[in-house]
Design a protein with these regions (language model features):
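Active-site-proximal beta-alpha core segment in soluble small-molecule metabolic enzymes
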Residues: 37-125
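Short, basic, glycine/proline-bearing loop/turn elements
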Residues: 6, 32, 52
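N-terminal glycine-rich anion-binding loops that anchor highly charged ligand groups
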Residues: 15-46, 59
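A generic structural signal for short
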Residues: 11-12, 34-35, 54
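Generic N-terminal amphipathic, Lys/Arg-enriched alpha-helix
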Residues: 1-11
Length: 125
């Protein structure tokens, strides 16, 4: 096989599958829930495979990543990134329809922005 003469990404799919399964087995064996961060691959099919192997849900760093994953059918998303501003709150409101969404809050400003959203069960450690 000749290689392209420009930069490209090559993924050994068998090795990737082996690594995903091995990590999930290890975590399962130690009673650790896996909620992988999709920022490393940003590919809904890989996130779906992680769920099929036993991940509890996915983590997205940005609202746009969460929107892409939800549109692809992934419905349990954790968004640890603080959302500030009405435009992002409205995008979050639209995203919440039909999925389980968890967010973090680390300031009063963020909490005030989220206060207008329909909330389910809140967990406060």
């Amino acid at each position: 096989m000749s290689l392209p003469d420009t930069p490209y990404l090559a993924v050994d799919l068998d090795l990737m599958e082996s690594n995903l399964a091995r990590l999930q087995r290890y975590l399962d064996g130690h009673g650790i829930a896996n909620r992988p961060h999709v920022k490393t691959h940003k590919i809904p099919a890989i996130a779906q495979r992680q769920l099929e192997l036993g991940a509890a849900g996915i983590t997205c760093q940005k609202l746009g990543e969460a929107e892409v994953m939800a549109a692809a059918g992934l419905h349990d998303i954790f968004l640890p990134y603080n959302l500030v501003g009405q435009a992002k709150i409205e995008r979050l409101r639209a995203l919440m329809a039909g999925i389980t969404l968890s967010v973090t809050v680390d300031s009063e400003v963020v909490a005030r922005g989220l206060a207008s959203l329909p909330l389910g069960t809140a967990y406060v450690p």
